[in-house]
Amino acid sequence: MTYGCVLINVDNGKVTQVLEKIKRIEGVIDAFECFGRFDIVVLIQTNEVSELAMITAEINSIEGVGKTETLVAS
């Protein structure tokens, strides 16, 4: 099992839209808005690291997503 925590910066005014799209992605077990350096935290669970990479690529393709940082545990 592989777990990921994706920390996301989002363009101004886009947090709600981005969060709704992220929550629909298969493999995302939770996603929520936060305060501080990042705007959204996403928790992901997959069977393989390659699946985690595909999910993070999908997140990065969402309009309004800026910088991301992914933490991985397997």
Which residue stretches match the model-derived regions?
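A compositional/biophysical signature of low hydrophobicity enriched in polar/charged and small residues
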Residues: 1-74
